[in-house]
């Protein structure tokens, strides 16, 4: 989910996400239910980058693609699972890159597999994520080699 949407959803509840240096606070937290607070915490790093103006649409496209690939592996029903399955059946190298990426997230502390990898991203995972994204876009745009 785009951090912009998360911020908008919080504001609809009469609260606001506020940046204080490198930390994130919820103004009027009494207006936000606990599950949403936990959801916000799971996307904290991305939200902070967004509020600082450092989160581009291109970066979001890459991260959203990785989120969808992780959902695919977790067995989450998505419209594009068949497309991802087809891609992986034709692109072994991408499968290996995704496996390496998942190991990196694990090494960075990602243990609750039902939460976003957002807080476990690093320069190394960002670089590998971009490589995977570019391979996916190339495949889905017709270069199936």
Regions found by a protein language model. Give the residues of each.
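Phosphate/adenylate-binding glycine loop and adjacent helical scaffold
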Residues: 4-7, 23, 33, 39, ...
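Eukaryotic low-complexity, mixed-charge intrinsically disordered interaction/regulatory segments enriched
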Residues: 9-33
């Amino acid at each position: 989910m785009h951090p912009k949407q998360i911020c908008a959803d919080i504001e609809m509840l009469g609260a606001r996400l506020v940046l204080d240096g490198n930390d994130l606070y919820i103004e009027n937290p009494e207006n936000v239910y606990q599950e949403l607070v936990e959801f916000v915490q799971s996307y904290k790093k991305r939200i902070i980058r967004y509020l600082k103006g450092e989160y581009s649409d291109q970066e979001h496209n890459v991260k959203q693609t990785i989120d969808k690939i992780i959902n695919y592996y977790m067995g989450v029903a998505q419209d594009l699972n068949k497309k991802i399955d087809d891609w992986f059946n034709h692109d072994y190298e991408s499968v290996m890159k995704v496996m390496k990426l998942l190991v990196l997230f694990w090494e960075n502390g990602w243990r609750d597999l039902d939460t976003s990898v957002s807080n476990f991203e690093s320069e190394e995972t960002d670089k590998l994520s971009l490589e995977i994204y570019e391979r996916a876009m190339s495949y889905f745009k017709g270069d199936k080699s």
